[in-house]
Amino acid sequence: MLLPALACISGAFAGGRLFDEIWVVGLFLLLFLLFLSVFVRNRTRETFLWFLSVLFFLVCGISMASILEQGQSEHSIYQYSKKGKLTISGTVCGKPERGERRVKLLLSDVSVKEKGHEPYKAEGRLTVYVYGLKHHVRCADRVTVQSEIRLPRNFANPGGFDYERFLALKGIRGIVYAGAHDLTVLESENRLSIADSMKRTINSQREEFARFLSSTVENRKSAAIFTLLTTGLTTKTPEQVRQSFAKAGASHILAISGLHLSIVAGIFFSFFNFVFRQSESLLISGANRKIAAFAALIPLTYYALLSGFSPSTQRAYIMIVVFLFSYVAEKQGDGLNSLCAAAVMILLLDPASLFSVSFQLSFAAVLFIICGFTLIKEVPAARNKSLGGRVFIFLCISFFAVAGTFPIVMYYFNMICFVQLVTSLVIIPALGFVCVPLGITAFFIFPFLPDLAAF
């Protein structure tokens, strides 16, 4: 899977830089047809792999180019940026982010109406900031806003953050500022689709658990950290707390990723395995563990969706699913192949994920851990099962993760953390192996046994 993964990465990168030229697209289409003809004549595994890689390169490249090109079309939201006050309708996608003074909404399926004209469906998404909003706006609500559309603008600092491109990669073509009196909710619950109903249910469960933690845990900062660790909700966590974790080199523990999903998979695999072991026939045949692996996919998928399904969560989810299927098929799992499979699936669905910081950090860390352990697997300390050997492995994991993410952190955040290896010995065991398992267990049982979850 390494070659297809490299093809997807190269295609997504080229799509943002080269595919706006028609001759480049024609050249790669010609290359694709050439590989197709070779594959038809010589159907070997290697030829098929190259053919598939060229296909993935084209798909990711053209998809990436189309994402960036939408903003330049005549149907884009861009075209309404200088037309004064408009009637803007859209569907709230994702969870509304409530701050101290304003609420941030992301609108999709946008239509725009000028005074004296019919509504017009526009391409792209809108970020809407509503000031003084008291009533609750939920995911999948259809809303109308009376305001003007502004284009995203970069600061003129050389080498500064490219805010315009950042929003364009998310499909966001404009920004709207409005007061609470300018916003109206149009659509009711009985008109929601199944997908929208699921999104709303998941978001409401995250909010309900966040309120449960706030009422149970006396310290507000502790409650906010527990909420972030278990549900991925960032709006409840003070900026000061996030900065403290970042300076200590432990901000990765706050992101829902491999650690959290592995705990969920492990907890439910053990639970279902215990249940199915009660059947003598399943126990004798050995099918209890395979059925438990399949059953664990249900709560694992639910938790991945509930946490927001960020690129780091997607990577961890796909790798765990590949591992579970390898376990069921009784085949030896390959970490690098699983990582490459995750990259291929994510980039084929959304090539813009390549430019996400969470995607880069997550994949770089895991890649360095996998490659690092191939180098030290014959070291006696790494093969030692004693406490000292486990501490050595733990330190190696932290070191390889730091080495992989070090350049990315420097580039994006202008920050270097020299104490991460030290803090990893304290923070990760305390949070990762005590707080996170307890928090996740509490989340799954609090709807049924709230007193036990509070304990």
Predicted regions and their residues:
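Transmembrane helix-bundle segments that form internal channels/tunnels in multi-pass membrane proteins
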Residues: M1-S76, K85, F272-V275, S279-I284, ...
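Hydrophobic alpha-helical transmembrane segments in multi-pass membrane proteins
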Residues: L3, G11, N42-R45, V176, ...
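Alpha-helical structural context
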Residues: R17, F212, T216, V275, ...
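Membrane-interface helix/helix-cap signal primarily in integral membrane proteins
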Residues: W50, C60-H252
